[in-house]
Amino acid sequence: MDLSVTHMDDLKTVMEDWKNELLVYKFALDALDTKFSIISQEYNLIHGHNPIEHTKSRVKSFESIVNKLMRKGCEITTKEMKEHIHDIAGVRIICSFISDIYNVVNVLKQHEDLRIVKVKDYIQTPKPNGYRSLHLIIEMPVNLTNRVEYVKAEIQIRTIAMDFWASLEHKIYYKLNNDVPKQLTDELKEAAEIAHYLDEKMLGIKKEVD
């Protein structure tokens, strides 16, 4: 439904529609949280090692969705939202080692109730600023009382070092209103390389112990 309404009753109806749609994405996150908890416990039971340190999840705010639709030149409707925004539901998985990241992905590929739509591997091919992470766009069913809805979600999987770097970079850009001097961007990129070296070093030590 379109947001261009003139009467208060119409506006209330529109907002209810949006609230209901976003609730479906919240249910998707609930299901994913359960899925990752099962993966952690079963993997630990079989391999004696938990590949997931912790997870964070969020549903994009209404304001963020509207802003993103406007940037894309889309109408502000729930239909456009579903078609053009695939990270409304987002999960971030933090792993100890780089190998854990790919192990988690391989487990997800075996789940019949989840379809991997797109993979962006910024570990093998980092962004120009040094950012590393593995991004998945997945599609999954959400079983409601009277229907099944298929929704997309974004899963970001990264190591503790990658997450620390990304969090710091985000804070710096936010504090400086995206106007970051070249000296700082160069230092951030250097820090990203150091973080990656640490990841590789710790993975090497793990392999020696194993």
UniProtKB/Swiss-Prot annotation:
The UniProt GO MF terms for this protein read:
ATP binding; GTP binding; GTP diphosphokinase activity; kinase activity
Query: Null-mutant phenotype, please?
Result: No visible phenotype, double yjbM-ywaC and triple relA-yjbM-ywaC mutants are also viable.
Listed pathway(s): Purine metabolism; ppGpp biosynthesis; ppGpp from GTP: step 1/2
Pfam families tied to this protein: RelA_SpoT
Q: Matching InterPro entries, A to Z?
A: GTP_Pyrophosphokinase, NT_sf, RelA_SpoT
Induction or repression = Weakly expressed during exponential growth with a marked and transient increase at the onset of the stationary phase. Protein expression is very low during the first 3.5 hours after inoculation (at protein level). Induced by alkaline shock.
Q: Where are the transmembrane segments?
A: none
Q: Does the keyword Transferase apply?
A: yes
What EC number(s) does the entry state? Answer: 2.7.6.5
| Enzyme class of the recorded protein, top EC level | transferase
What is an annotated GO biological process for this record, any one?
A: guanosine tetraphosphate biosynthetic process
Keywords linked to the UniProt accession? ATP-binding, GTP-binding, Kinase, Nucleotide-binding, Transferase
What's its catalytic activity? Answer: GTP + ATP = guanosine 3'-diphosphate 5'-triphosphate + AMP
Spell out the subunit comment: Homotetramer.
Q: Which family does it belong to?
A: Belongs to the RelA/SpoT family.
Report the protein's function.
Functions as a (p)ppGpp synthase; GDP can be used instead of GTP, resulting in an increase of (p)ppGpp synthesis. Overexpression in relA mutants (triple relA-yjbM-ywaC deletions and single relA deletions) leads to growth arrest; GTP levels fall drastically, various guanine-related nucleotides are synthesized (ppGp or pGpp), the cellular transcriptional profile changes dramatically and 70S ribosome dimerization occurs. Overexpression in the presence of a wild-type relA gene does not have these effects.
Mention any additional remark.
The synthase activity of YwaC is weaker than that of YjbM.
What name does UniProt use for this protein? GTP pyrophosphokinase YwaC
From what organism does this protein derive? Answer: Bacillus subtilis (strain 168)
